[in-house]
């Protein structure tokens, strides 16, 4: 291929053209035969393959009566189908509502209700469960089995809707740390800016290979990684589900140069016995939440990874902080991505700036119009609560050093992070409170075994009626009906009384300090 061929999306510097539909059509027109996605244990797609298949899906949706502005909810784990429905929804100007396929019960019901979609497109393996949930609760929603939806016809490219910079094109649900999970409404510019952050801060080019093993129903997998590849011509290597045992082999086999990982993945990799093949790969960039100093050192020295880039962000605010190439992270988040964002540490009660070196709340706002969420779907009160005094309040505690580096300290909100997922303590508690003999519940994080980088385990303290004899296995099984697999507690504790504030709020900080006590029951089935 001619060395002068330009693979980077031509309008990357012009926000007016930050639209997924336009990106796909331009890239498929200029580079139709470039192999852009490889599904491990599956097919390989060119830009043209991607476009044609997405236009076929768009025709299916059009035949079902979808029109610009409608919401379409998908409950799909298969990355091939997920990607095609995502692009098809962009082609028609729809609002793509992506649900985490691990959720179930009341949490799933809440998310389907709030999305206000006429149809939920469900992967075959989940169809019976979701269909039953919808019918049982008399929702005015139709569930469609994705396996039964096919079309040889496609809409014409002239029918593709590009939309505007400000159009909401995606909804992803994030943990409701003090209430139900919230649907983050994401405009075109916000989605594309995730990808631009990766391109600019990772120096991503067409000759690179990006390994994606994180779920596409999160912004990390779909926008930071996949969309960044689509905009640059870098090849996306997709494993449908993370496999700890296959991670290193995949990195070597597919000549991976870039990847994003979670803390738990990093902890697994560095815990493997040293091997003479540890540097036998082409991996040059790892993007991750800040790693402790020792795992980062091991990646750099033992595995020879040139850049281990820390970053800080969330679905609502994009990635406003990146580590710098050729710089040791040392557990820090990096510096502000000043081209597009402002970040300050402020007093969480007074909303005023505080001095460098002091702990306060991390607050963010965009410089790029619509480079942020537009709000929480159906929850205007929550939008106002987090976005006040012209700053988004992340609920995270942090420090800004005089050098301009930011340090993440802890979560102000009662959010638990496990297996790469943010878990709402509220939703875990509600799953137990539905059990008739449970009177009070408090879910909180306990450090996982394995040291730094292993994230959290879920612990739930419970109060029960005095005359009840507890069988912990039955208790877990009852709660599981309304819990995602990653939300199932490892530890349960029955208490006679909770520590509480004067206003009656459970003091979870005291429960966390007590940790795993002698009267704690451990779930050995997770």
What feature does the model see in each segment?
Residues 46-48, 169-193:
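Conserved AMP-binding A3 loop
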Residues 32-33, 155-173, 180, 203-209:
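Conserved pre-ATP/AMP-binding loop-to-beta segment of ANL
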Residues 93, 192-209, 217-257, 272:
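Conserved AMP-binding/adenylation subdomain of ANL enzymes
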Residues 41-43, 58-106, 422:
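Conserved AMP-binding/adenylate-forming
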